Amino acid sequence: MFVLNEFTRRGFLGTAAAVGGTTVVTTALGGAPAAQAAVPEAADGGACGARTALVKVDRVDRRYQDLVTRGFNGRFRGRPDVVYVVHTADQVVDAVNQAMAAGQRIAVRSGGHCFEGFVDDPAVRAVIDMSQMRQVFYDSGKRAFAVEPGATLGETYRALYLDWGVTIPAGVCPQVGVGGHVLGGGYGPLSRRDGVVADHLYAVEVVVVDASGRARKVVATSAADDPNRELWWAHTGGGGGNFGIVTRYWFRTPGATGTDPSQLLPKAPTSTLRHIVTWDWSALTEEAFTRIIDNHGAWHQSNSAAGTPYASMHSVFYLNSRAAGQILLDIQIDGGLDGAEALLNDFVAAVNEGTGVEPAVQRSTEPWLRATLANKFDTGGFDRTKSKGAYLRKPWTAAQAATLYRHLSADSQVWGEVSLYSYGGKVNSVPETATATAQRDSIIKVWMSATWMDPAHDDANLAWIREIYREIFATTGGVPVPDDRTEGTFINYPDVDLVDERWNTSGVPWYTLYYKGNYPRLQKVKARWDPRDVFRHALSVRPPG
């Protein structure tokens, strides 16, 4: 069995991109992908005249296959009756009304990076494709930056930075769409410094369907006196496909004052200092591996408060299976920070202390935007995948570290990985009920994945990831229940196994794992704004009762 995993896609590709800057230790890739610049403030019709009319693509249209195969996960392929390509909020209203009149179940796609088959569900008959709604501009009326859901993170970063010098603390993959990323409370390299992206969400425009079955536009803001405020709150981590269709976000940092756009969102760094640290599996004994895991966890337990010198540091530890050849620690920090190089050196030394193994270290410095846009996410055609997640409040136990070693070091052709993301910092300074993103007391975010190409290998790969996940959380029913050690999991890492009692024996329902105590409040929003349960999928917020 030959399988390509996330390490190959992010690890090797990311490493190559990292060392192509102004300070070079090894050779590397070149520049950043092209992205759409900001456009002037515009009404719904667009900044440069009327936008394209609503496009309706059926199964015989030559564009159909391109539109229905945009999903990230090749395990799922939908066959809807129609795909609506929309360009304005009014067109979204029109498309929803047409689908409702035809009795078609609706799903929405922006970037297409959902890990499960929520859009490519066989029951979905109408897909509303948001990819052409991609404007980014400053809205002086709201003193906030408007971003449409079809814009990618890369396009958004480029526009915000080149025109105003600001950014949002969103994800590392520039191809990901803004639409679902923000809805799930997305995070990224600046989250320890600035919080999750939803912490900077001021307002949202949503197309909802009322009890009569008619669609309409609603704007909801964070203002305390806004009668629609709960709808805004639900979009700060409630996840996609629950309440309606987002047609526009507005971003402004809470407490930001004045009318100067350059002061209304976090300033982007001017440069990024990056270290890529690799350990060869051939040199790793179980003792060395578990010591690295222990050191990594202990460091985060001591360095995850807000406002420390490490606030702008982001690291991803790619614990790859032996088939990949290496494990890799990818670290970056604000290159303009005094002592940045020493901070990263100290972090690497702390993680490697007492292992007896000397890792390879590649160092680079490059302009922030170039570094940010260079993290291209490429599956290389290996697009069948399964993902799982967790939040850690404390480091792995000795038993969990041993479980990681046993599964990852096995002589297997399954190329899986367990990725450990630095977390905490500013994220943890926000009360868990202030937004729908409830996990506000964690030090590490975990993403587990297996990725492969051949459908014949589905069973082996699914078994691998399910078994490692269940064993790691064996003492809590096979899942990371909210307790003193773990804090549930991340809705943008959707995992339908959490609904299945074969894999979740904890007695804790899936919605508590994702939303903790915020779920009943989300249900109330659902009841008000989607009373007919038009927007639903396998892990959607259920109507109350």
From Swiss-Prot:
SUPFAM superfamilies: FAD-binding/transporter-associated domain-like. Aclacinomycin Y binds at residues 451, 493. Changing residue 421 to F: The oxidase activity for the first reaction is similar to the wild-type. Loss of oxidase activity. FAD binds at residue 492. It is an enzyme of class 1 (oxidoreductase). Optimum pH is 5.5. Pfam families: BBE (PF08031), FAD_binding_4 (PF01565). Changing residue 187 to F: Loss of oxidase activity. Loss of oxidase activity. It comes from the Bacteria. It catalyses: aclacinomycin N + O2 = aclacinomycin A + H2O2; aclacinomycin A + O2 = aclacinomycin Y + H2O2. Its cofactor is FAD. Residues 1-43 form the signal peptide. Disruption phenotype: Cells lacking this gene accumulate various aclacinomycin analogs. Residues 76-256 form the FAD-binding PCMH-type domain. The active site is at residues 421, 493. Binds 1 FAD per subunit in a bicovalent manner. There is a cross-link at residues 113-173 (6-(S-cysteinyl)-8alpha-(pros-histidyl)-FAD (His-Cys)). Keywords: Antibiotic biosynthesis, FAD, Flavoprotein, Nucleotide-binding, Oxidoreductase, Signal. GO terms for molecular function: FAD binding; oxidoreductase activity. Involved in the modification of the terminal sugar residues in the last two steps in the biosynthesis of polyketide antibiotics of the aclacinomycin group. In the first reaction, it catalyzes the oxidation of the hydroxyl group at carbon C4 of the L-rhodinose terminal sugar moiety of aclacinomycin N (AclN) to a keto group, modifying the sugar to cinerulose A and generating aclacinomycin A (AclA). Homotetramer; dimer of dimers. AknOx uses two distinct sets of catalytic residues in the two reactions. Tyr-421 is responsible for the proton abstraction from C3 of cinerulose A in the second reaction, for formation L-aculose. This is Aclacinomycin-N/aclacinomycin-A oxidase. The lineage of its organism: Bacteria, Bacillati, Actinomycetota, Actinomycetes, Kitasatosporales.
